[in-house]
């Protein structure tokens, strides 16, 4: 059995981040910054440029921004973030920027000859959705991460079939 330690550590950090996020704890965002760096390195090794660009160029900066907004907007008990209700303007911005992000990154990934380009592009879209909703302090962020997890399972199944590595 061939286990990649970096992938194992990244998975543990990522899962821990999601647990803290579910509790509305700002440590979720700090762990997401660390996870983004680890995941960027793993993605680079597999030439999954979309994943690398997404996590280092979008998820990590959004996690930094979310750390700031979460610290500035604590709930009344002071232990978690105050949830913000999504408004129509948030949904419009989400759809507009999500569409632009998807189109732009599809072409970037095509130029970089990214393997599994369709799933890589969908992963960028779902990552954007999750990061944007997290930054907005919306409880719907988990929906974005759940969609992204489904896409990532498919994407990394392709990678493991190609490289015959066992990740977990």
Locate predicted features.
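Hydrophobic alpha-helical membrane segments of integral membrane proteins
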Residues: 30-34, 50-54, 143-147
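Polytopic alpha-helical membrane-helix bundles and their juxtamembrane interface segments
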Residues: 1-24, 72-74, 80-168
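Transmembrane alpha-helical core residues of multi-pass small-molecule transporters
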Residues: 35-38, 57-58, 148-151
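Membrane-water interface of transmembrane alpha-helices
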Residues: 57-75
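Alpha-helical transmembrane segments
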Residues: 46-62
């Amino acid at each position: 059995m061939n286990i990649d330690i970096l992938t194992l550590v990244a998975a543990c950090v990522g899962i821990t981040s999601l647990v803290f996020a579910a509790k509305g704890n700002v440590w979720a965002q700090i762990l997401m910054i660390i996870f983004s760096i680890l995941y960027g390195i793993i993605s680079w090794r597999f030439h999954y440029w979309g994943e690398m660009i997404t996590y280092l160029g979008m998820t990590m900066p959004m996690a930094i921004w979310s750390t700031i907004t979460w610290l500035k907007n604590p709930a009344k008990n002071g232990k978690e973030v105050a949830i913000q209700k999504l408004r129509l303007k948030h949904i419009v911005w989400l759809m507009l920027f999500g569409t632009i992000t998807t189109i732009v990154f599809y072409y970037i990934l095509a130029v970089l000859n990214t393997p599994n380009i369709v799933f890589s592009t969908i992963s960028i879209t779902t990552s954007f959705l999750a990061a944007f909703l997290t930054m907005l302090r919306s409880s719907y962020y988990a929906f974005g991460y759940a969609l992204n997890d489904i896409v990532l399972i498919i994407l990394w199944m392709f990678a493991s079939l190609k490289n015959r590595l066992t990740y977990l």
